């Protein structure tokens, strides 16, 4: 079975690589040191510091594994390869819900770079799926768990 690929910009991949380096060179050694200190407290069966450190170690190792997979199977997307006004990973899109006045701006990213609070939506999200491949002036229907709504694409530009 073919491994899943993770479409992303080169910048997103570089960010993941830095995050992985931080986990391996800083967080992992810190956790190992905390485990060592907690072990020195004696009886491990009632040692909450040891349990907490082991839990954190499992979390950090899970993050490392996840990042390594995303980096290994990264598919670098070149937003210059699509039309200038076409929605793709690496593009900034301004949309407006039909019948509303407010405009919304999103940056389309691969799933590894999604950050809703920063306005970065994944190409796999309902918004991303509805917008990918559309062009300035097109309308799109965004399907959500609570219903659907139509938006007009006002502007598409390369993300700075």
UniProtKB/Swiss-Prot annotation:
Q: What GO MF annotations does this protein's record show?
A: DNA binding; RNA polymerase binding
Coiled coil (residue ranges):
1-72
Q: Which InterPro entries match?
A: GreA/GreB_C_sf, TF_GreA/GreB_CS, Tscrpt_elong_fac_GreA, Tscrpt_elong_fac_GreA/B, Tscrpt_elong_fac_GreA/B_C, Tscrpt_elong_fac_GreA/B_fam, Tscrpt_elong_fac_GreA/B_N, Tscrpt_elong_fac_GreA/B_N_sf
What task does this protein carry out?
Necessary for efficient RNA polymerase transcription elongation past template-encoded arresting sites. The arresting sites in DNA have the property of trapping a certain fraction of elongating RNA polymerases that pass through, resulting in locked ternary complexes. Cleavage of the nascent transcript by cleavage factors such as GreA or GreB allows the resumption of elongation from the new 3'terminus. GreA releases sequences of 2 to 3 nucleotides.
Record's protein name: Transcription elongation factor GreA
Q: Name one GO biological process term.
A: DNA-templated transcription elongation
Q: Which Pfam families match?
A: GreA_GreB, GreA_GreB_N
Protein family according to the UniProt entry: Belongs to the GreA/GreB family.
Record's keyword terms, sorted: Coiled coil, DNA-binding, Transcription, Transcription regulation
Alphabetized Gene3D superfamilies for the sequence: Transcription elongation factor, GreA/GreB, C-terminal domain, Transcription elongation factor, GreA/GreB, N-terminal domain
């Amino acid at each position: 079975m073919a491994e899943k690929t993770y479409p992303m910009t080169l910048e997103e991949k570089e960010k993941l690589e830095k995050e992985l380096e931080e986990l391996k060179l800083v967080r992992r050694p810190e956790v190992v040191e905390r485990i060592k200190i907690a072990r020195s407290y004696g009886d491990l069966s009632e040692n909450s510091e040891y349990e907490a450190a082991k839990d954190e170690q499992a979390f950090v190792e899970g993050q490392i594994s996840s990042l390594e997979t995303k980096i290994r199977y990264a598919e670098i997307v070149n937003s210059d390869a699509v039309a200038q006004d076409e929605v793709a990973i690496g593009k900034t899109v301004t949309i407006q819900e039909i019948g509303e006045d407010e405009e919304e701006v999103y940056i389309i990213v691969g799933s590894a770079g999604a950050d809703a609070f920063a306005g970065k939506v994944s190409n796999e999200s309902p918004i991303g799926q509805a917008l990918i491949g559309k062009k300035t002036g097109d309308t799109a229907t965004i399907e959500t768990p609570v219903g659907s709504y139509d938006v007009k694409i006002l502007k598409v530009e390369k993300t700075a």
